[in-house]
């Protein structure tokens, strides 16, 4: 029998953390972070990490598991998430994965072994084709496909496109999970308004100080490449004004949200819910109760 689990996915700033905690309280669950940036200790504001109060309301896994100068990959996530799921289920609780890193979630749920065998001649031919494209053409291709990459540079863009193109040929082991994937969504303009408001709130909470510490000490680390930090570095170096840097941060976050939605719509089987609907989140809870074969709110 496959292990049932819940996934709360969607773009940034739609309330995934709040819903995850509510579901954990209602369905006797524990949360596994599915966010590539929240693994880093000391990076709390820019990653929109669950606050100490929120973490006290529900047990969280895969938060604060790496130092800021360490790397983290989809393989690391799958390995550690599988261990967390086994632990949670062994204690009679429900695993609830909350996050917006589509590649991580897909790799876990669909059983892809990222090191699987692919016809290398096909890969090389496709790579040669990509090498003929300009940087702008590569980045436009990345954006149109909704692919998430940590850093916008040519090498990473080509590698990401190769993975996207040949993912169906990777070794696909039978997954042992039966997920119910909740996708949170809203009108695009409302999501963008929430993003802009959240960036302003992050600044009030100390984002500039957090980003400056990262800039001064670990500017070349993988953790520093995430949206929320790198946009502020030109301000610290004197290349941009604060207003220019913050506008760039908001713009990049909005674009990232668009890519996240594209990924979840095109690459995963998701049940979407409009967060501005009067029926939200009651409709989510009702659907989960049916999925879990239990009466609403009981465990």
Swiss-Prot record:
User: Which domain of life does the protein's organism represent?
Assistant: Bacteria
Query: Where is the site described as Interaction with substrate tRNA found in this chain?
Result: 101, 127
Where is substrate annotated to bind? 12-17
Keyword field: ATP-binding, Magnesium, Nucleotide-binding, Transferase, tRNA processing
Enumerate the residues binding ATP.
Answer: 10-17
Region Interaction with substrate tRNA, as annotated, extends over 35-38
InterPro entries per the UniProt record, alphabetical: Dimethylallyltransferase (IPR039657), IPT (IPR018022), P-loop_NTPase (IPR027417)
- Swiss-Prot/TrEMBL catalytic activity: adenosine(37) in tRNA + dimethylallyl diphosphate = N(6)-dimethylallyladenosine(37) in tRNA + diphosphate
**Pfam family for this entry, one:** IPPT
Per the UniProt record, which EC number(s) apply here? 2.5.1.75
**Which terms does the record give in the GO molecular function aspect?**
ATP binding; tRNA dimethylallyltransferase activity
One biological process GO term for this chain? tRNA modification
State its cofactor. Mg(2+)
Question: Which family, according to UniProt?
Answer: Belongs to the IPP transferase family.
Q: Which HAMAP family match?
A: IPP_trans (MF_00185)
Quaternary organization: Monomer.
The function of this protein is: Catalyzes the transfer of a dimethylallyl group onto the adenine at position 37 in tRNAs that read codons beginning with uridine, leading to the formation of N6-(dimethylallyl)adenosine (i(6)A).
Q: What is this protein called?
A: tRNA dimethylallyltransferase
Organism of this sequence: Streptococcus thermophilus (strain ATCC BAA-491 / LMD-9)
Gene designation: miaA
């Amino acid at each position: 029998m496959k292990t049932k689990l819940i996934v709360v996915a969607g773009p940034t700033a739609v309330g995934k953390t709040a819903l995850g905690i509510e579901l954990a309280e209602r369905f006797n669950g524990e949360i596994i972070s599915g966010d590539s940036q929240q693994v880093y200790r000391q990076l709390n504001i820019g990653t929109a990490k669950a606050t100490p109060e929120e973490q006290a309301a529900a047990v969280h896994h895969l938060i604060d598991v790496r130092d800021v100068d360490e790397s983290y990959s989809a393989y690391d996530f799958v390995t550690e998430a599988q261990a967390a799921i086994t632990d949670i289920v062994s204690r009679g609780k429900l695993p609830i994965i909350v996050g917006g890193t589509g590649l991580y979630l897909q790799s876990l749920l669909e059983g892809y072994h990222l090191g699987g065998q692919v016809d290398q001649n096909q890969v090389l031919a496709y790579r040669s084709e990509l090498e003929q494209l300009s940087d702008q053409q590569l980045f436009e291709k990345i954006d149109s496909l909704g692919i998430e990459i940590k850093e916008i540079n040519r090498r990473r863009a080509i590698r990401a496109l190769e993975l996207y193109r040949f993912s169906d040929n990777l070794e696909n082991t039978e997954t042992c999970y039966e997920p119910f994937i909740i996708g949170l969504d809203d009108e695009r303009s409302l999501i963008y308004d929430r993003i802009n408001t959240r960036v302003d709130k992050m600044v009030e909470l100390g984002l500039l100080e957090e980003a400056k510490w990262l800039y001064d000490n670990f500017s070349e680390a993988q953790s520093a490449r995430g949206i929320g930090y790198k946009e502020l570095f030109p301000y610290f170096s004197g290349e941009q004004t604060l207003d220019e840097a913050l506008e760039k941060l908001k713009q990049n976050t909005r674009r990232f949200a668009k890519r996240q939605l594209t990924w979840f719509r095109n690459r995963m089987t998701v049940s979407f819910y409009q967060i501005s609907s009067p029926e939200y989140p009651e409709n989510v809870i009702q659907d989960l109760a049916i999925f879990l074969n239990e009466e609403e709110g009981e465990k």
